Amino acid sequence: MKTHPMTALERCATALLTAALLLPSAALAQREGVDVGANSGFASLVPAKEIELSAAKQYKTLLAEAASKNALAPPEHPQLQRLRRIADQLIPFANEWNPRAKSWQWEVNLIGSKQINAFCMPGGKIVFYTGIIEQLKLTDDEVAQIMGHEIAHALREHARERMGKSTATSIGAGVVSQLLGLGDLGRTVTNYGVQLLNLTFSRSDESEADLVGLELAARAGYDPQAGVTLWQKMSASSKGAPPQWLSTHPAGNTRIMDIERNLPRVMPLYERARKG
């Protein structure tokens, strides 16, 4: 069978995809805290800035819809002030996990709804629903665990990674030409933007977010043991019709055991933070 030599574009496409998939991240230096390894090379297939811009647009639309229903909490709302105070304590520790976080325009908002839900979109756009706070009767330590978990998804760029994997499955000369600036990749990312709120993460992503969130909360002075009580509450609340947050955040004994196994790594950070 006659074979044809690869074109320059095909060679470039092969090299680009290989680099993205095999990209070895620099080994993490010995550090205190949890060990979740390096970010996936798939994320490099999608520009971070485009994802963050799409997220910001979707976030703005969500807040406008909530405001039109009188469901967006005003700045003086006690629970919103509480959330923003906790966020202010967590965010300074985000930069270690993702240097882009330094330039993010962080936002924290509260929407009145019975939904047991919360999220942090790429670029640091955080939303909590009143249902998750009120129905679970969350302590500050437990709020910090949820917020840390959601921030961790953004810091570890799990949404970008998922989109990168989707790109990789259909990659070809046309897609690669877009990645090389020869096409309109922005349109592809914009199409993904409408799906950002509906993305579900893998079990690996969820475990990683649990641990990174655990460390963020500990460094900010919130008790890591609240990660256990939080998931006990979540498990109890999931009986019957599971809440939306749990439908994309699988809970269970394995998850609690994983947190307990990592407590010795983060308790010293918490104790140091408490001492000031």
Located regions from the model:
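A Zn2+-metalloprotease active-site environment signal
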Residues: 2, 21-276
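Bacterial N-terminal signal peptides that target proteins for export
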Residues: 2-16
